[in-house]
Amino acid sequence: MRLTALFVVAALALTPPVSARQAVQTAAARAWAMPERELMVPVEGGRVWVSVNGDLKATAAPVVFIHGGPGSTHTGFGGLTALADQRAVILYDQLDSGMSDHPNDPANWRVARFVGELEAIRKALKIERWHVVGHSWGAAIALEYAASYPAHVASTVLGGTFISTPHWILGTNLLIRDLAPQVQRDILACEGNNRPPAEKCKAAERAFSAAYNGRPDAPPRSPEAQAYRKRTQGKGFNEKLYNAMWGPSEFSARGSLVGYDATPLLAKLDGKRTLFLVGQYDEARLDTVRDYARLTAGAELAVVPGGSHSFGAERPVETEGLLRGWLARKDAK
C-alpha cells in the first residue's frame, strides 16, 4: 500500500506533467457543465438516467461515477465534468433516485441489481473498458462491479469507502467518542429506547456531520453548481429507499444492509489499479480504509486534505487534481 497524498501540494503533483496549474484552470472552466448527452437506459426494474460529457471515442478511457446513499443522486459529482477535457465523464442516478424511474419497489433494492445497472450502462454506451469511481455506498457498488467484471475495468476508485456495515458502524462509534461529551450523550440517548426530543437528536446529528460529513468551511455553491443541481436533481434523495436499505439513523444500520460485508472481494481486485480515496476528516475512518488498502496488494491510498466524507464538495480542486492524475497514470499502463 502506498499513501499518495496528505497535503494539497502532493495532491496536485499527481496531475499529468502538463502542469497542475493548467488542470486547475480547466476544472474552473468546465466544472458543472450541463450534460452533453442524456439517455434513459433500461435496467432490471425500470430505466436509469445517464449523462455523458466528453468524447466516448477519446484515447483516454471513459470514467463513470457511482453516487452514494442508497437513495442519493449523481449531483455531488457535477463538478467533475471538468475531467471531460481528456475523457468521457459518465454520471447516472440509480433506480428510484434523482432523474431515474421511481417504481419504488423494494424488490429492486438489492446489491446485485444495482451492480447490474452499471453493466447495463456500459453496454448501452458500447464501452469496452472504463474507470469506475464510487463514493460511500457507491464504493460498495464499484467494488462489487470490479470483482465481477475485471475485463472491463481500467481502474477502480473506492472513495469515502463503505464496503462493510459492521466496519462502518464500529468506525462511527469510535468517531462519536471524539465529539463533545454532551453530543456523545445525546447521540447515545437518541439511539436508545427513550429518545429525547427530536430537535435534540437533530442537533446531535448536525454536530456529527459538521465534524465528519459536511464541514462548515466548505466553499459556497457556485452559480454554476446551483444551476446544475436545479436542472438535474430530478426527484432528489429517496428517503424510503435509504431507510429500507440502511435505516433512519446514521449511527446504526437496521435495513437490508445490516450484515453487508464485501471485504473478501478486495482480494479479487487488481491492486495496482485500485485507489482508496478519503477525506482527512472522513466518516470512513482512515485506519479502517488503510486496512482495506493493505488487503488489496499494490493498492494506493489518497487523502484529501481538509476534506470530510463530502471531500468532493469541500475540496473540489484537490479532488479533481487527484483523480485527474490517477486516471492519466492508469491510462498509460
Map each language-model feature to its residues.
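N-terminal cap/lid segment of alpha/beta-hydrolase-fold proteins
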Residues: 28-47
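Conserved HGGG/HGGXW glycine-rich cap/lid loop of the alpha/beta-hydrolase fold
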Residues: 45-102
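Active-site loop/oxyanion-hole signature of alpha/beta-hydrolase fold enzymes
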Residues: 94-137, 321
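Conserved hydrolase catalytic core segment
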Residues: 128-171
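Conserved loop-alpha-helix segment in the C-terminal half of the alpha/beta-hydrolase fold
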Residues: 263-306
